[in-house]
Amino acid sequence: MAQDLSEKELLRMEVEQLKKEVKNPRDLISKTGKEIKDYVEAQAGTDPLLKGIPEDKNPFKEKGTCVLS
């Protein structure tokens, strides 16, 4: 699609997108960083990547062995 548009049309689309983006509310990283850190620390107890998965609920655990004779 972009190949069919002229450079002027592409620049107009980019300006339209930038006008939309400039309206987005922005917060200071000092505020949002603390919020993210607090959230991660609060969720750490239930995070399976940190805590691990119980053996009985592990979907990747070997079900058993198969013996072919």
Curated annotation (Swiss-Prot):
Which keywords, in A-to-Z order, does the entry hold?
Cell membrane, Lipoprotein, Membrane, Methylation, Prenylation, Transducer
Subcellular location per UniProt equals: Cell membrane
Positions the record marks as coiled coil are none
Instruction: Provide the residue ranges of the propeptide in this protein.
Output: 67-69
Question: Chief location of this protein?
Answer: membrane
State the InterPro entries in the record. Answer: G-protein_gamma-like_dom, GGL_sf, Gprotein-gamma
Q: Name one GO molecular function term.
A: G-protein beta-subunit binding
* Highest taxon of the lineage: Eukaryota
As stated in the Swiss-Prot or TrEMBL entry, residues carrying the post-translational modification Cysteine methyl ester are C66
Biological function: Guanine nucleotide-binding proteins (G proteins) are involved as a modulator or transducer in various transmembrane signaling systems. The beta and gamma chains are required for the GTPase activity, for replacement of GDP by GTP, and for G protein-effector interaction.
Quote the protein name from its UniProt record: Guanine nucleotide-binding protein G(I)/G(S)/G(O) subunit gamma-T2
The species this protein belongs to is Mus musculus
